[in-house]
Amino acid sequence: MSENKFLPICKDDMIERGWEQCDFVLVTADAYIDHHSFGTAIISRVLENAGYKVGIIAQPDWKSVDDFKKLGRPRLGFLVNGGNMDPMVNHYTVSKKLRKKDLYTPKGEMGKRPDRATIVYCNKIREAYKDVNIVIGGIEASLRRFAHYDYWENKVRKSILVDSGADLLVYGMSEKQIVEVADFLNQGFDGKYIRHIPGTCYIADSLDEIYEEHIVLPSFKEVSSDKRTYAECFKIQYDEQDPVRGRTLVQEHNGKYVVINKPEMPLSREELDRVYALPYQKTYHPIYEKDGGIAAIEEVKFSLVSSRGCSGNCSFCAITFHQGRIVTSRSEDSIVEEAEEITKYDDFKGYIHDIGGPTANFRKPACKKQLTLGACKHKRCMSPGICKNMEVDHREYLHLLRRVRKLPGIKKVFIRSGLRYDYIMADKDDTFFKELVEHHVSGQLKVAPEHVSPNVLKYMGKPAGKTYDEFRRKFFRITERLGKKQFIIPYLMSSHPGCKLEDAIMLAEYLRDINYQPEQVQDFYPTPGTLSTTMFYTGLDPLTMEEVYIPRSKEEKAMQRALLQFKNPKNYNIVYDALVKAGREDLIGNGPKCLIRDKNSFGKGNNHSNHKSGGRKNRNENSGRRESEDKKRSSHSKKQRGNKSRGFDQKSQRGSKGKKRR
């Protein structure tokens, strides 16, 4: 028996296993990493467990068909994904500039995958084997299954199923449906005619071929020519994205019909345990050793996946359209067993980097009704506030963390996935919060409030009001009580739909009041499949059909970004222009509440800002020791601005930031 426990990547590997032919060949735009944080690994191992022979072609040269032929023609078909990240996001920044590194590629080298990899790979496979079955999946296919707005081309593109020429699309996490698809292919079915499986999409020649109850969406032609129709279409997709109550959706594309079956039910706890117990090698293929490995493994190698799905439903997040709103989780025993395995790694230093998921402190469905009735159609679980029916309980997660941190060989267990601070604050039992601060923060707790303007938070689907400030103050009280020096690092977003210049200034004032300057700011990135992207494209909120302000110009987006780093002298001129444009000259000058000094009030070499530039030292001023100062500042700031409509009361001006970006 071969010592190589990775799946075959070449003919020699197949010979070692005694294979003459693969059942499936999986083509991916990422390097081959056999770890359950990567879709390629999960799908290939699930199929292997079901008795199928799977080979891997990772990052093939798409300029010829040679790489696509290196494992031969598979008996049942090709499986294609664009990698763990949409290739366009992987390649380009929000300003559409080419990124410098690809963390899913040896040496971080760019250029090893094409733009729109799924489409390119399918075309090459068709060139190599004209009539072979092709099934596409992964994040790129999932989020582009409908006609969708494409930010990089600034137009509406067809469903990726149409553009790729594939026979079938599986969306979501796909473990259930890929095995069912494989079984039908194994029985001799043509991929084009496997049409009844939840979580799949196919193309029909006419509506008469669709037997399930369905909704006919506006066609590709209609949504690509009218933005209001696009928004209305997205609302239907959004409402039907539920495995319990969702219905089949149909969208015409130039005389043919893309049929999107309702989502597959999430895996049960027992099913998840089985998936995560498969024989992953938990690292990259040894062919990459000569290039120093693959950087993407580093963040997940000593991390544990606890859950899937998210009840948070943030507008800018794609989780709803990929994993869904119903949270499921692995058993404690499954996670503890994997933690014990990690302690045996030669390079393990005693630190578990994370136990989490899309949201670390979610371990179960938001309420009992979700598994029988589905998630609510016209309400969100946590926005604008936490639903009264949501079951807030950290006890199981807390028990899990305690078990793992007590294991021999483990020094610390950190939580680096996102935490919903509003969910933490809604828990009447403080035990989890206290133990989080005491045991699970690696010096800095990263959370994602994203903004402070109530208007912007409304469009983001994020909690508004005093919740974050209360969380921040409580975090520092507990930290101080424990005698620790720990900080909160907030994720912030600029230029989200609905964010006007005055909203960005409000956030800048908030950062001034807590004496914090973020080292990085994320501009809103319109990626496929999100509510926020639909707002960006149409200028409408699909949930209400009301108009939404969209910061589109490079000038305004630069202003909003610079305002969040107003202490940086390089941003002085653009911050000055932004304040003048907004009529907020009261924030220019030498007063304690001014963001920047007046141009005529400093000499050469002096800082333009009234505040020290925000490096690590300044960032760490965001601590509990400043709480009394925050209170004084808050009251004074409100009087100085004299504008309650800006969304602050005295209390809400005090805080900092907190929660994970999805």
From Swiss-Prot:
Cofactor remark: Binds 1 [4Fe-4S] cluster. The cluster is coordinated with 3 cysteines and an exchangeable S-adenosyl-L-methionine.
Positions with biased composition (Basic and acidic residues): 618-632
Domain of life: Bacteria
Compositional bias per record (Basic residues), positions renumbered to this chain: 633-644
Cysteine pairings via disulfide bonds: none
Region (Disordered): 597-662
UniProt xrefs under SMART domains: Elp3
MF GO annotations: 4 iron, 4 sulfur cluster binding; catalytic activity; iron ion binding
Cofactor field: [4Fe-4S] cluster
Residues given in the record as [4Fe-4S] cluster binding sites: C310, C314, C317
Pfam families reported for this sequence: DUF3362 (PF11842), Radical_SAM (PF04055), Radical_SAM_N (PF08497)
Radical SAM core domain span: 296-567
Family in the record: Belongs to the UPF0313 family.
UniProt-recorded name of the protein: UPF0313 protein CPE1196
